[in-house]
């Protein structure tokens, strides 16, 4: 079946934003497709919120242009752009009922009164709060207030919904529930969601696509699986979850995709795909904690694996995390295993000598200069 070409709804072309002599975004190019859930992810100060505010029209561009649904809106005011924003604080009017909060934007647009009630109630039904229409925001929980803020944003039928750290004020359990609700609502509405967060788990859970930003630039653009399993640089690898970074030296090429290498003393095959490598070249081998296999050894026992000793353990319910200090260089390696209380080989002791291996092909390999 032929894949349908996706329609572009938002495009940032060579966008630069500076405050005085401080540049926050530099030549940012970004294409966002109609109907997708896109997350802009990055640490504080990376420029993600600035990018969102530029799309919304709350900030003026220094250079570049912003295209919304085929129209250049670079000089169009915020209230005339076909987007709505949900803020971290929700910004609900405490003196108004839920109905009037949701109806506020429609009244500002001078929508006829006979259209307001059905549109407001439709929006409230979408977030399953139609029975709370006559209550005040203070009578609702944090999660319910979040849903009202979303209802108020979608009642105007925007082409794009912008969400700025919108779940960060919620407790962990409620945040997890809202992640699922937001994604379900986005599918139901079929409109583009652009979500800004520093929370990697939120991004991986909800997104169709993730833009990882660092220092005002795109560090990687990909699906959640690509971002987690195939990081293109060390910044992305370390920002998205835990990762172990090993030094490696190429010994010889085995075939088009694999080389024999010395990885922290372990001689093994690693996949380099289409990388151009030569003998004695330095590489970085990246492995997630869950990809490493740990085997207990007696103190006098030798192994061709990477050798270390357990210095700490953390029980996490479904998993057991072990911190291993490598014997040859003192590096700490994190290993995560599914916990099985009936398996005596899982519940390791602090001080235990261990051998570390992994299934060849599970590693990510980067050039040393990429790190």
Curated annotation (Swiss-Prot):
CDD domains for this protein: ABC_PotA_N
UniProt GO MF annotations: ABC-type putrescine transporter activity; ATP binding; ATP hydrolysis activity
Residues involved in ATP binding: 42-49
Pfam family, one: TOBE_2
Keywords of the record: ATP-binding, Cell inner membrane, Cell membrane, Membrane, Nucleotide-binding, Translocase, Transport
SMART domains the record matches: AAA
The reaction(s) this protein catalyses: ATP + H2O + polyamine-[polyamine-binding protein]Side 1 = ADP + phosphate + polyamineSide 2 + [polyamine-binding protein]Side 1
Membrane topology: Peripheral membrane protein
Cellular component, GO annotation: ATP-binding cassette (ABC) transporter complex
Source organism superkingdom: Bacteria
Enzyme class: translocase
InterPro entries for the chain: AAA+_ATPase, ABC_SmlMolc_Importer, ABC_transporter-like_ATP-bd, ABC_transporter-like_CS, Mo/tungstate-bd_C_term_dom, P-loop_NTPase, PotA-like, PotA_ATP-bd
PROSITE patterns attached to this UniProt entry: ABC_TRANSPORTER_1 (PS00211), ABC_TRANSPORTER_2 (PS50893), POTA (PS51305)
Places the protein is found: Cell inner membrane
Sequence ranges assigned to domain ABC transporter in this UniProt record: 10-240
Keyword Translocase: yes
Listed EC numbers: 7.6.2.11
Oligomeric form and interacting partners: The complex is composed of two ATP-binding proteins (PotA), two transmembrane proteins (PotB and PotC) and a solute-binding protein (PotD).
Family, similarity comment: Belongs to the ABC transporter superfamily. Spermidine/putrescine importer (TC 3.A.1.11.1) family.
Record's function text: Part of the ABC transporter complex PotABCD involved in spermidine/putrescine import. Responsible for energy coupling to the transport system.
Name of the protein in question: Spermidine/putrescine import ATP-binding protein PotA
């Amino acid at each position: 079946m032929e894949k349908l070409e996706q329609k572009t709804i938002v495009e940032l072309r060579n966008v630069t934003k500076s405050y005085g002599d401080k540049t926050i975004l530099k030549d940012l190019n970004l294409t966002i497709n109609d109907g997708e859930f896109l997350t802009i992810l990055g640490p504080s100060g990376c420029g993600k919120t600035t990018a969102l505010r530029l799309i919304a029209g709350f900030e003026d561009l220094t250079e570049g242009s912003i295209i919304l649904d085929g129209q250049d809106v670079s000089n169009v005011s915020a209230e005339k752009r076909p987007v709505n924003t949900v803020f971290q604080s929700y910004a609900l009017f405490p003196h108004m009922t839920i109905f009037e909060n949701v109806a506020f934007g429609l009244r500002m647009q001078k929508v006829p009164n006979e259209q307001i009630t059905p549109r407001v109630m439709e929006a409230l039904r979408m977030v399953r709060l139609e029975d709370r229409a006559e209550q005040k925001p203070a009578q609702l929980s944090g999660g319910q207030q979040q849903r009202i803020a979303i209802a108020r944003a979608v009642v105007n039928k925007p082409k794009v919904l912008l969400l700025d750290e919108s779940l960060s004020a919620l407790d962990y359990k409620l945040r997890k529930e809202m992640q699922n609700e937001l994604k379900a609502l986005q599918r139901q509405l079929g409109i583009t969601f652009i979500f800004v967060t520093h929370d990697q788990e939120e991004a991986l859970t909800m997104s169709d696509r993730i833009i990882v930003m660092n220092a005002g630039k795109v560090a990687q653009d990909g699906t959640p699986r690509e971002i987690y399993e195939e990081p293109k640089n060390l910044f992305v690898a370390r920002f998205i979850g835990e990762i172990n970074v090993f030094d490696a030296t190429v010994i010889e090429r085995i075939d088009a995709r694999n080389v024999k290498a010395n990885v922290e003393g372990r001689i093994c095959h690693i996949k380099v795909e289409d990388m151009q490598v030569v003998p004695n070249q330095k590489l970085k081998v990246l492995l997630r904690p869950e990809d490493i296999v740990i085997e207990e050894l007696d103190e006098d026992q030798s192994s061709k694996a990477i050798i270390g000793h357990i210095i700490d353990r953390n029980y996490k319910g479904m998993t057991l995390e072990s911190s291993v200090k490598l014997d040859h260089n003192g590096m700490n390696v994190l290993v995560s295993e599914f916990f099985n209380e009936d398996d005596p080989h899982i519940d390791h002791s602090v001080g235990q000598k261990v051998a570390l291996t992994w299934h060849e092909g599970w590693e990510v390999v980067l050039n040393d200069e990429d790190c």
